[in-house]
Curated annotation (Swiss-Prot):
GO MF terms held by the record: kinase activity
Keywords: Kinase, Transferase
Organism: Arabidopsis thaliana (Mouse-ear cress)
Stated role: Involved in the regulation of plant growth.
Gene: VUP2
Signal sequence range: none
Region of interest (Disordered), ranges: 84-130
Official protein name in the record: Vascular-related unknown protein 2
SS bond partners: none
GO annotation, biological process: multidimensional cell growth; xylem development
Further information: Plants overexpressing VUP2 exhibit severe dwarfism.
Compositional bias per record (Acidic residues), positions renumbered to this chain: 103-121
């Protein structure tokens, strides 16, 4: 009886050729049902599991399943199960996966060590740059009653120089980071001259 139900179901499903004919006759937008039927027709092949030949319609009461049916999830589960069995039985694949996991762990450990080193140097007071000490000195002068009106031109020049140096350093670091990623910063005027 089970075989007669399967044969009946198989006979009522459209073949790939019939779907193509329907699709060629209709010149307007492709229906999602056509894709659905093509998928069903593609999956209509028999799947051998545990020595038996079974069909995925066996557990379905309707001829064509609706969106709430487990047909799609069953298909995904079968694929996942096959891949898992393939990896577990093949010792070469197991070795490759094991090596890949070890490499990832080593990279994570190296990255954590580098972050710790960077934090140590950044937080130590001996590694402060001269630029920040000059700016701190200028701020100290304003605290002790020396306003910007009383600042000499030499001090103003020093502060503007340090500010421009900071901007240059930041731009260089930004450009270096972009170059590492394969990007290049080009002035807009240079680009417009190239296009024109």
């Amino acid at each position: 009886m089970e075989n007669s139900v399967n044969n009946c179901v198989r006979q009522r499903v459209f073949s790939n050729h019939q779907i193509r004919m329907i699709h060629e006759e209709e010149d307007h937008e492709e229906s999602s049902w056509i894709v659905y039927f093509e998928d069903i027709d593609h999956d209509d092949e028999m799947v051998e599991t545990e020595g038996e030949m079974t069909h995925y319609y066996d557990n379905d009461s309707s001829m064509i399943s609706d969106a709430a049916s487990p047909v799609h999830t069953t298909k995904i589960n079968n694929v996942v199960r096959r891949k898992a069995n393939n990896i577990n039985t093949n010792p070469k694949k197991r070795r490759i996966i094991h090596q890949h996991k070890e490499e990832e762990e080593e990279e994570l450990q190296k990255g954590e060590e580098e972050e710790e080193d960077e934090e140590d140097t950044a937080s130590s007071p001996s590694n402060k740059t001269k630029i920040f000490s000059v700016l701190d000195h200028a701020n100290d002068n304003t605290r002790y009653g020396k306003t910007m009106d009383n600042v000499t031109s030499e001090e103003i020049g020093c502060i503007t120089e340090t500010g421009s140096k900071i901007k240059e350093i930041m731009n260089e670091e930004f450009s270096a980071e972009l170059k590492k990623r394969g990007l290049c910063v080009v002035p807009l005027s240079m680009l417009s001259n190239f296009i024109a």
